Amino acid sequence: MRFFLAITALVAAVTAAPSADVAAVNQMAAMTLAEADASCGNGASLYCCDKSKQGGDTGSPGQAGGVGLLGAIVGVNGLLQGLLGQCSKININAIGAAGVLNQECTARAACCQNTPSVAHHGLVNIALPCIPINSLVG
């Protein structure tokens, strides 16, 4: 009886799990550089982030850090830096705004703040300088 209940709960959990949003995936595939830059908004620029990227204009566009509880996770050498890796700015003026985003950035495109990100002293401090663009589209 318990085995049947466990299997039923597992099946219910799997069927209730959200599926990939096909419209958002298609929108990301056809997104131009101008649309991606507009998604970033004011005060942020479009970057291409890749863990294995070396050389060129790489580095953190802003300092992510804090002295609070999550400072070690989000800090300059923290866990979240590994999610995006090294980032280089996509110069839209040099490339042209009509270019397709996934042709110019085969890794992960992100919107990064133009000013350093600072988390002030407190219990939970999160200062994220970059946000993946696929989390802004949808």
UniProtKB/Swiss-Prot annotation:
Membership in a protein family: Belongs to the fungal hydrophobin family.
Pfam families documented for this protein: Hydrophobin
Name of protein: Class I hydrophobin 3
Cleaved signal peptide residues: 1-16
Localization per Swiss-Prot or TrEMBL: Secreted; Secreted, Cell wall
Organism name: Cordyceps militaris
Induction comment: Highly expressed during the whole fruiting body development with a 3.66-fold increase at the ST (sclerotium) stage compared with the HY (hypha) stage. Expression responds positively to light irradiation.
Assembly: Self-assembles to form functional amyloid fibrils called rodlets. Self-assembly into fibrillar rodlets occurs spontaneously at hydrophobic:hydrophilic interfaces and the rodlets further associate laterally to form amphipathic monolayers.
TM region(s), chain numbering: none
Top-level taxon: Eukaryota
